[in-house]
């Protein structure tokens, strides 16, 4: 376990916000959690779990303890002719796990290449891209309650997965520190190529689908649309794509015939938040140190020196204008930390 006081966070969040935390703690194993459960000072402090800081926005310095996983390793639990079950440490970098799966010919997560963050965060956020959500592949999440010390295995159904949602986003489950995530990946060749943007590139460039070619293509597409946080601070997609009723969508389509849409199994329709934002004139918008990325309106950026409150203010301005123009309220995918 590594403990640091008055710790700078500019390199611990992809927005590059120059906040600080009173305490930063890296945990690596169950024994570290056991120690924290017995520590009186820790138990009296405000605690927030944090991954790679790729899906949050610090609005101020954090007064308390940020708890960060350094649990590493990949263990093979079971293997048959069709699939393999892997247990992965929550502190492993997500894209390193994707690369490992591709190198070993394990199918299922190649479409999720280059998504920033840790393995633990994948289970919290239910990350998704190019037609795949990680909840389709998660069997179980192993967690420790950092107040009581309780150990619990959350089966997939326990996590109540939905679009960009899991039970771990609820306040009642915020004090669970994720230790490991179990993924069942496929051993037989099988690809998810229903997503139009990905399928179009593969077809136009006559790329034969393989694990590596799909990973390479996804990485290329993402790099063309999203800025590198090392160069321009950002948290990727800032807003969740809204889901509206069929009736609401039909009304919108009458006024905006070119509006993109993704029909959902329950009859509702998902609308790209980036398109809504772009229609309000924000693509490429800049106000001082903050702005909207020129190649993807869903991405808010820190050009250097911006505060979290400045980014948050731009987000609220966008929310208000989208609501006024379309009657749709956008919700941040990024978590605000006060």
Curated annotation (Swiss-Prot):
Entry cofactors: FAD
Subcellular location: Cytoplasm
Domain FAD-binding PCMH-type: residue ranges: 17-188
GO MF, one annotated term: UDP-N-acetylmuramate dehydrogenase activity
Keywords of this entry: Cell cycle, Cell division, Cell shape, Cell wall biogenesis/degradation, Cytoplasm, FAD, Flavoprotein, NADP, Oxidoreductase, Peptidoglycan synthesis
Catalytic reaction(s) noted: UDP-N-acetyl-alpha-D-muramate + NADP(+) = UDP-N-acetyl-3-O-(1-carboxyvinyl)-alpha-D-glucosamine + NADPH + H(+)
GO-annotated cellular components: cytosol
EC number annotated for this UniProt entry: 1.3.1.98
Active site (record annotation): 164, 237, 333
Recorded superkingdom: Bacteria
Cysteine pairings via disulfide bonds: none
GO process terms (BP): cell division; cell wall organization; peptidoglycan biosynthetic process; regulation of cell shape
Pathway where this protein functions: Cell wall biogenesis; peptidoglycan biosynthesis
Location (main, coarse): cytoplasm
PANTHER family per UniProt: UDP-N-ACETYLENOLPYRUVOYLGLUCOSAMINE REDUCTASE
Database matches in HAMAP family: MurB (MF_00037)
NCBIfam families recorded: murB, PRK00046.1
Family, per entry: Belongs to the MurB family.
Protein task: Cell wall formation.
Protein name per Swiss-Prot or TrEMBL: UDP-N-acetylenolpyruvoylglucosamine reductase
Provenance organism: Porphyromonas gingivalis (strain ATCC 33277 / DSM 20709 / CIP 103683 / JCM 12257 / NCTC 11834 / 2561)
Gene: murB
């Amino acid at each position: 376990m590594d403990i640091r006081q008055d710790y700078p966070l500019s390199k611990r969040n992809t927005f590059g916000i120059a906040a600080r935390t009173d305490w930063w703690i890296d945990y690596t194993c169950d024994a570290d959690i056991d120690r924290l459960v017995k520590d009186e000072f820790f138990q009296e402090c405000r605690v927030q779990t944090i991954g790679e800081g790729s899906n949050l926005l610090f609005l101020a310095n954090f007064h308390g303890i940020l708890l960060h996983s350094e649990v590493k390793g990949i263990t093979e639990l079971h293997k048959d002719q069709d699939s393999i079950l892997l247990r992965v440490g929550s502190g492993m970098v997500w894209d390193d796990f994707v690369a490992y799966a591709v190198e070993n010919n394990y199918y299922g997560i190649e479409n999720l290449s280059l998504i920033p963050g840790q393995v633990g965060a994948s289970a919290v956020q239910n990350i998704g891209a190019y037609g795949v959500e990680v909840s389709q592949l998660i069997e179980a999440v192993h967690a420790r309650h950092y107040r009581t010390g309780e150990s619990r295995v959350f089966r997939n159904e326990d996590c109540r997965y939905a679009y960009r949602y899991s039970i771990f986003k609820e306040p009642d489950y915020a004090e669970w520190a994720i230790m490991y995530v179990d993924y069942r990946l496929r051993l037989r060749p099988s690809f998810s190529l229903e997503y139009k943007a990905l399928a179009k590139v593969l077809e136009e460039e006559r790329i034969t689908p393989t694990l590596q070619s799909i990973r390479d293509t996804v990485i290329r597409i993402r790099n063309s649309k999203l800025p590198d946080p090392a160069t321009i601070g950002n948290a990727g997609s800032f807003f969740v794509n809204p889901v509206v009723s069929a009736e609401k969508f039909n009304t919108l389509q009458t006024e905006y015939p070119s509006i993109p849409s993704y029909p959902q199994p329950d009859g509702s329709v998902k609308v790209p938040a980036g398109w809504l934002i772009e229609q309000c004139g924000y693509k490429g918008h800049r106000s001082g140190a903050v702005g909207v990325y020129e190649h993807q309106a869903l991405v808010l950026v820190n050009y250097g020196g911006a505060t979290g409150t400045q980014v948050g203010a731009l987000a609220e301005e966008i929310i208000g204008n989208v609501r006024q123009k379309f009657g749709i309220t956008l919700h941040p995918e990024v978590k605000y930390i006060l």
